[in-house]
């Protein structure tokens, strides 16, 4: 989960993307109601990619990982690449229908880039 704090605008990301978002404890940070009860491991991350998520995937004994989320062109691609770097033999899949990018074009570009890096992207 993208997790930022009140000092977000003072961070490198905040200086380059000066839009306060996902401030911990706010409605914009919480999962939608439909996902609140979903069981599974959640990772709070204050950067685009999560090394903790990559380590968990690499050490978890999984036969594949599926990613979904926002933004395809920032966080989803970053986490797909972290997992591929930390667990190169672990198949990673991104469901394009369960993601969205900043723009339709950047969404598509990110999906194409992930596909080039051997991430499964059904329908692309």
Question: Which residues make up each language-model segment?
Answer:
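Von Willebrand factor
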Residues: 1-7
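Active-site-adjacent betaalpha module
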Residues: 7, 11-124
């Amino acid at each position: 989960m993208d997790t930022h704090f009140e000092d977000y605008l003072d961070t490198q990301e905040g200086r380059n993307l000066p839009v306060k978002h996902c401030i911990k404890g706010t409605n914009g940070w919480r999962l939608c109601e439909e996902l609140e009860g979903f069981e599974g491991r959640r990772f709070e991350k204050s950067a685009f990619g999560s090394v903790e998520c990559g380590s968990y995937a690499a050490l978890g004994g999984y036969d594949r990982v599926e990613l979904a989320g926002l933004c395809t062109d920032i966080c989803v691609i970053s986490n797909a690449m972290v997992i591929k770097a930390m667990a190169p033999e672990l198949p990673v899949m991104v469901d394009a229908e369960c993601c969205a990018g900043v723009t339709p074009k950047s969404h598509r570009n990110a999906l194409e880039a992930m596909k080039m890096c051997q991430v499964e992207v059904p329908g692309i």
